[in-house]
From Swiss-Prot:
GO terms for biological process: regulation of DNA repair. InterPro entries: RecX_HTH_1st (IPR053926), RecX_HTH_2nd (IPR053924), RecX_HTH_3rd (IPR053925), Regulatory_RecX (IPR003783), WH-like_DNA-bd_sf (IPR036388). It comes from Yersinia enterocolitica serotype O:8 / biotype 1B (strain NCTC 13174 / 8081). The keyword Cytoplasm applies. Gene3D superfamilies: Winged helix-like DNA-binding domain superfamily/Winged helix DNA-binding domain. Pfam families: RecX_HTH1 (PF21982), RecX_HTH2 (PF02631), RecX_HTH3 (PF21981). This is Regulatory protein RecX. Modulates RecA activity. Keywords: Cytoplasm. Its main location: cytoplasm.
Length: 167
C-alpha cells in the first residue's frame, strides 16, 4: 500500500485529479525508475504485470479523501476556471469533466458557483482569433460561429455576440 500511496501523493502533488482519474492511474502499470509508463525494470515484455488489488486502491482513495488531498468538487471548480481561462466554453468543459468521471451534480454545482460571463468570454475568444472587429458578412460569420461551437460555446452565447454588436 505504501508504494501506491506514495504514487497517489506524487500524482496529487502535481495537480488535482478526479477520483475516477486517480483510480485509473493507480490501477495502471507503475512508473519505472526512468519514469516511462508501462515499463518495469527487470521485466521482459512477455511477462504479465501483477494486478493491483482493488481493495488497496480503495484504501488509498479513502486515505486521500480523509486528508483532503482528493476532492471532486474542488477539482471541478479548478478545472472550469482553468479551461475557461484558455478560452473554452461551458459545453466543452462539461463534456471533459464527464469524461474524467466527475458526477453530474458536482459539475452543475461547480458551474453555478463559477462567476464566468460566458457571453463575454465567447466574444473575447472570437476577437482574439478573428480580430477586434467581428465580421458581418454571412460567410465570415459562419466561420466564427463554427469556431466558437468547436470551443464549446452554446448557440445563444454566440448569437449574443452579434446581438450586442448590432446594438
Amino acid at each position: 500500500m505504501n508504494d501506491l500511496l506514495s504514487r497517489a501523493m506524487r500524482l496529487l502533488s502535481q495537480r488535482d485529479h478526479s477520483e475516477s482519474e486517480l483510480r485509473r492511474k493507480l490501477a495502471s502499470q507503475p512508473f519505472s525508475a526512468k519514469g516511462h509508463w508501462g515499463k518495469q525494470t527487470g521485466r521482459s515484455d512477455n511477462e504479465p504485470v501483477a494486478d493491483i488489488d482493488p481493495k488497496v486502491i480503495e484504501q488509498v482513495i479513502a486515505y486521500c479523501y480523509q486528508h483532503n488531498w482528493l476532492d471532486d468538487a474542488r477539482f471541478a471548480t479548478s478545472y472550469i476556471n482553468s479551461r475557461s481561462r484558455k478560452g473554452y466554453g461551458a459545453q466543452r468543459i462539461r463534456s471533459e469533466l464527464m469524461q474524467k468521471g466527475v458526477d453530474k451534480e458536482l459539475i452543475q454545482a461547480a458551474f453555478e458557483i463559477s462567476e464566468i460571463n460566458w457571453c463575454l468570454l465567447a466574444k473575447e475568444v472570437a476577437q482574439r482569433k478573428f480580430s477586434e472587429i467581428l465580421p458581418i458578412e454571412w460567410k465570415e460569420k459562419v466561420k466564427v460561429q463554427r469556431y466558437l461551437l468547436y470551443r464549446g460555446f452554446f448557440q445563444e452565447e454566440i448569437q449574443s455576440i452579434y446581438n450586442d454588436f448590432v446594438e
